[in-house]
Every structure is written in C-alpha cells, then in structure tokens.
Curated annotation (Swiss-Prot):
Single strand-specific metallo-endoribonuclease involved in late-stage 70S ribosome quality control and in maturation of the 3' terminus of the 16S rRNA. GO terms for biological process: rRNA processing. Binds 1 zinc ion. This is Endoribonuclease YbeY. Transmembrane segments: none annotated.
Length: 154
C-alpha cells in the first residue's frame, strides 16, 4: 500500500526560496518517504524548516541545550507501532547558511548539499543513527546513498 503523504515546507528567510523551490522538495520527499515507509501506514506527515544560522542556533539551544548552529536537526515523532495507521514522522530543520558554506567547502552544488542534509534528517526521523556503532553508521550511509539515487535519478 502507498501511504498518502503530507510534506510541509517552512522558510524563515524568503531569500532561500530562490535557490531551493518548494515543489521539487515536496516531490523528492514523496519519493524518499514512499521508499522508506512501512507497508502498514495509510498516511505519513513530515515538516521541513529552512532557516538561517541565527534561528538554527536558537532551536539547537532550546531543543538540545547546545547554543550553536549546525547544518541539520531532526526531531522524530515516528513510532514503529503507532496505535493507528497514521504517522507524523517528525521535523527536519536545515540551516541554509550552513548548507551553502558546506557546499562551497566540499565543492559541490547547493542543491546537492541540501538534499544530502534533507535525506540525513529524514533517516534520523525513521530511527537510523550513525553515532551508535560502525554497523549502524554503514547502514545509514547505504540508505542515504539509496535515497539520494532516487532524488538524482535521471
């Protein structure tokens, strides 16, 4: 069964909308979520926030007690056994300022870096974790590659 999907995008700085457009983000999230979603779900909801470094630092301090900016944060609400077949997956927050800096440092495009961060955040919302042990890190990396292949398939 293919779940119905709701993806919500929110910007705190409209200048980012000229580089990352909402419609492709939503359609690419739908590809990723359909790939990752368990069969029993009837619907799945995800919120994506694109923010500047200042707001990211505020969110990071408020939600994690770390008063610094970062590239991506995930706040999962996912449960493997929800009481009903409707699931609010969680939130992904991406600092577009940090995303731009990292893209330049790494030497690839902003869109590539944006989707790398988005996929990373979505996977965390599904319970993947690269910090527990090497095996989990390798699995998460494999899933990141598979999701990015879906996004960038020609």
């Amino acid at each position: 069964m293919n779940p119905s999907l709701s993806v919500f995008t929110h910007w705190n700085d409209e200048s980012n909308q000229s580089e990352i457009f909402s419609d492709p983000v939503i359609s690419n999230c739908e590809k990723i979520l359909r790939f990752l979603a368990p069969e029993f779900l009837h619907s799945l909801e995800l919120s994506i926030y694109l923010v500047n470094d200042s707001l990211m630092a505020e969110i990071n301090e408020e939600r994690r007690g770390k008063p610094a900016t970062t590239d991506v944060l995930s706040f999962p609400l996912y449960s493997e056994h929800p009481p009903i077949p409707v699931q609010i997956l969680g939130e992904v927050v991406i600092s577009m300022e940090t995303c731009k800096k990292q893209a330049m440092e790494i030497g690839h495009g902003l869109v590539d870096e944006f989707y790398r961060l988005l996929v990373h955040g979505i996977l965390h919302n599904f319970g993947y974790d690269h910090e527990t042990n090497e095996e989990d890190a390798l699995l998460m990396r494999k899933m990141e590659d598979e999701c990015l292949d879906l996004v960038f398939a020609t």
